[in-house]
């Protein structure tokens, strides 16, 4: 959704974009299967929402990693065609990664191969996200912009959420 905001330092309006999306941890502080149970519930509700003609959700961005599609479809393979249709119709964005990387643990080649694998899976579903979606690492490696550009991505979502910081002047 596109929103206009006033900018007190300029006559031109600021334009902000709101993209419904999710960040999904496959395993963090709970075992994988507990997260998968939550994933199944989430995706079931998401598919129903995106298929509902009366829904206000024009589209949804699914986390940037394709491995969650595999996790879901291992349990509910009958929904593959529903997901493919939503991807092809531009209602569900998938990829470009196979799994969201921790950039400081792996090297540049691993990042490229991760993207290549994610591209292949995304395209099997009918398309891929054209944004370098990496919102949750503990920083970004210096070569990431070149890697993203090298695979044809010119936009980068580098963090999620916005803090409530207020300067001394208020």
What are these regions (language model features)?
Residues 1-170:
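Catalytic-domain carbohydrate-binding cleft regions of carbohydrate-active enzymes
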């Amino acid at each position: 959704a596109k929103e206009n905001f006033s900018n007190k330092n300029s006559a031109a309006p600021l334009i902000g974009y709101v993209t419904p999306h999710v960040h999904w941890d496959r395993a963090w502080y709970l075992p994988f299967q507990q997260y998968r149970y939550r994933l199944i519930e989430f995706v079931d509700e998401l598919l129903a929402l995106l298929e509902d003609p009366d829904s206000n959700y024009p589209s949804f961005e699914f986390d940037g990693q394709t491995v969650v599609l595999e996790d879901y479809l291992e349990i509910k393979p009958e929904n593959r065609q529903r997901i493919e249709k939503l991807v092809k119709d531009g209602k569900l964005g998938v990829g470009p990664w196979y799994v969201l990387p921790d950039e400081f643990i792996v090297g540049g080649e691993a990042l490229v191969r991760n993207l290549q694998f994610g591209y292949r899976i995304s395209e099997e579903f009918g398309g891929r996200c054209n944004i370098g979606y990496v919102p949750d690492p503990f920083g970004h490696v210096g070569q990431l912009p070149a890697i993203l550009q090298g695979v044809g991505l010119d936009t980068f979502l580098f963090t999620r959420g916005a803090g409530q910081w207020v300067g001394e002047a208020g």
